[in-house]
UniProtKB/Swiss-Prot annotation:
UniProt effect for mutating residue 31 to A: No effect on function
Domain of life: Viruses
Effect recorded for residue 162 to A: No effect on function
Keywords recorded for this protein, A-Z: Host cytoplasm, Host nucleus, mRNA transport, Phosphoprotein, RNA-binding, Transport
Protein name: Protein Rex
Effect of residue 107 to A: No effect on function
Compartment(s) of residence: Host nucleus, Host nucleolus; Host cytoplasm
N-terminal signal peptide: none
Sequence intervals crossing the membrane: none
Documented effect of changing residue 117 to A: No effect on function
């Protein structure tokens, strides 16, 4: 079965989608190229008046006139000409420039310490500071296996027994 080409329908220019800006009939644009910079002049005219190009002079940017530059050299300071002459005398092409020397650093045999050390995480320990005496809260928080100062709980030896286990005599 032979392929058939579909005819493309061309959109007429009049059926264009509307532009986002209003198209007005009362606008004439005149461009003047008589200056190095291009000036675009927009001339508005009322509808119905025959179009006539009105010359709009280009807007020249008026450069401000600066006061003459005063000498910035204080007495005793050499001028830039004297400095450049001195520099050109010291840098002559007769002697090639010496290669820059590397600064004397530490010997290469010793390993350099790392610039950044990895973070060190300390596990929480109960003996955080050996030199400081434990506070009252530290005494309560210590596990029972570690010897601790006498706690404020009553001693079992000083409490009178109210009941005796069977088999024992009071």
């Amino acid at each position: 079965m032979p392929k058939t080409r579909r005819q493309r329908t061309r959109r007429a220019r009049r059926n264009r989608p509307p532009t986002p800006w209003p198209i007005s009939q009362d606008l004439d644009r005149a461009s003047y190229m008589d200056t190095p910079s291009t000036c675009l002049a927009i001339v508005y005219r009322p509808i119905g008046v025959p179009s006539q190009v009105v010359y709009v002079p280009p807007a020249y940017i008026d450069m401000p006139s600066w006061p003459p530059v005063q000498s910035t050299n204080s007495p005793g300071t050499p001028s830039m000409d004297a400095l450049s002459a001195l520099l050109s005398n010291t840098l002559s092409l007769a002697s090639p420039p010496s290669p820059p020397r590397e600064p004397q650093g530490p010997s290469r045999s010793l390993p350099l310490p790392p610039l950044l050390s990895p973070p060190r995480f300390h596990l929480p320990s109960f003996n955080q500071c050996e030199s400081t005496p434990p506070t009252e809260m530290d005494a309560w928080n210590q596990p029972s296996g570690i010897s601790s100062p006498p706690s404020p709980s009553p001693n079992l030896a000083s409490v009178p027994k109210t009941s005796t286990p069977p088999g024992e005599k009071p």
